[in-house]
């Protein structure tokens, strides 16, 4: 089940969960990285991004784990670590703001290790049955 308006991929016990897969830092990168994750502060419409959605949890994928973070904890991480400075390149976006030219979205790059520090729980993929 996916609800694009409320920004969640599935629900468990009435709490929305948004799952974020591995992503590249730059489009030119050969492969996605598990060491960093993009966090959407504002979406392409200029409204609150998925980090500020009504979801209860965001699940971040790594090669071997699912890192489950409460949305409010993620918001605190953004508030406490992100510098309100815009950068022009994705390679400079670690804890800074990046906005594509002509778009209203605002994203920042965070370290996966910092997500693990605030995680509600971390699940080993080998322990999770598909």
Predicted regions and their residues:
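Nucleic-acid endonuclease domains
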Residues: 1-130
């Amino acid at each position: 089940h996916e609800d694009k308006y409320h920004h969640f991929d599935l629900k468990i016990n009435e709490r929305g969960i948004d799952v974020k897969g591995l992503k590249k830092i730059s489009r030119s990168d050969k492969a996605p990285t598990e060491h960093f994750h993009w966090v959407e502060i504002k979406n392409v419409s200029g409204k609150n991004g998925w980090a500020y959605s009504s979801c209860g949890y965001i699940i971040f994928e790594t090669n071997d784990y699912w890192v489950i973070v409460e949305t409010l904890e993620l918001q605190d991480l953004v508030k406490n670590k992100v510098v309100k400075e815009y950068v022009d390149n994705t390679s400079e976006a670690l804890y800074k703001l990046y906005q594509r030219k002509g778009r209203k979205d605002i994203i920042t790059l965070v370290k996966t290790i910092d997500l693990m520090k605030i995680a509600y729980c971390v699940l080993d993929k080998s322990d999770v049955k598909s």
